[in-house]
Amino acid sequence: MNKLIPLPREFFARDTNLVSTELIGKVLYFQGTTAIITETESYIGEDDPACHAARGRTKRTDVMFGPAGFSYVYLIYGMYYCLNFVTEDEGFPAATLIRGVYVISHNNVYTIDTAKIKSQITDEKTQSIIIRKNRRIMKFYIPNLKASNLYLNGPGKLCKYLGINTSYNKCDLINNKDFFVSDIGLNLPYYSTTRIGITKGTDKLWRYIVTDPKMLY
């Protein structure tokens, strides 16, 4: 695969729902593992009752107030970590929660041909990607993990697989060679639905999911 280039800060410093939708199909790179983002969720401002910032600016939520393009990682239920990317203009608290990814490489060894995926979506010619066949990603024990062991459908699962915890909170995703988001030209179809795992703001259609994750298998 061509060298991955981090998205600019300007990408994140925009309307959160726009960022959340455009993150679908982008790739998350974390310490040698590359994964296609397949599901996101928006949390926007102090008027969003489900947003952590609805409780005001605290030590925990300070990162949400910007600047954009930083990671916001927190622990829920005392056992699961959640990865978010800070969005919007500095001073306005908002973030996109990364709810699902499809892992395509581990230790920089690719297991699927993303060019083939792209060709299924668009008629444009795509550049070949070198794949080392018969190499599988390391398996980790994650409860309820789907059989593929690659499609991580849940924020806790993806953080556990990648090894993301609160030590990676407030990481700059722009000036970083080990932890960032990149665009490889995938424009995956998606749909919007209500957010889950919350008790307030459940009417917002701010959750975005790849229409058919099986296109990545």
From Swiss-Prot:
GO terms assigned for molecular function: alkylbase DNA N-glycosylase activity; DNA binding
Domain RPE2 insert residues, every copy: 105-145
Keywords attached to this entry: DNA damage, DNA repair, Hydrolase
Pfam families, per the entry: Pur_DNA_glyco (PF02245)
InterPro entries named among the record's database cross-references: Formyl_transferase-like_C_sf (IPR011034), MPG (IPR003180), MPG_sf (IPR036995)
EC number(s) stated in the UniProt entry for this protein: 3.2.2.-
EC main group: hydrolase
HAMAP family (alphabetical): 3MGH
Stated name of the protein: Putative 3-methyladenine DNA glycosylase
Organism encoding this protein: Rickettsia prowazekii (strain Madrid E)
Taxonomic lineage: Bacteria, Pseudomonadati, Pseudomonadota, Alphaproteobacteria, Rickettsiales
